[in-house]
């Protein structure tokens, strides 16, 4: 997918990708330069530990996108390379 960097160095992530990754305005991303390439990925979501009865439960600090079969397959494919 092709996009343009403006004169201020800003880059628009296409809507389809933002929606699939659950990214919204003001969300943070991690940018890495590796082997002459730019990698952009969602910044890790912080969690809050909440006690539910005798169990500690990790709750994300912001809503996360639903985990779909497609996301699981893509993640497995990426990690197996």
Swiss-Prot record:
Keywords: DNA-binding, Toxin-antitoxin system. The keyword DNA-binding applies. GO terms for molecular function: DNA binding. Residues 1-45 form the SpoVT-AbrB domain. InterPro entries: SpoVT-AbrB_dom, SpoVT-AbrB_sf. The keyword DNA-binding applies. It comes from the Bacteria. Disulfide bonds: none annotated. Coiled coil: none annotated. Gene3D superfamilies: 2.10.260.10. Physically interacts with cognate toxin VapC40. Antitoxin component of a type II toxin-antitoxin (TA) system. Its cognate toxin is VapC40. NCBIfam families: lp_hng_hel_AbrB (TIGR01439). Belongs to the VapB family. This is Antitoxin VapB40. It comes from Mycobacterium tuberculosis (strain CDC 1551 / Oshkosh). The gene is vapB40.
């Amino acid at each position: 997918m092709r996009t343009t960097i403006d004169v201020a160095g800003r880059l628009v992530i296409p809507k389809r990708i933002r929606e699939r990754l659950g990214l919204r305005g003001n969300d943070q991303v991690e940018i890495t330069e590796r082997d002459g390439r730019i990698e952009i990925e969602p910044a890790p979501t912080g969690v809050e530990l909440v006690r539910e009865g005798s169990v500690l439960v990790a709750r994300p600090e912001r809503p996360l996108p639903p985990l779909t079969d497609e996301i699981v397959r893509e993640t497995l494919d990426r990690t197996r390379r």
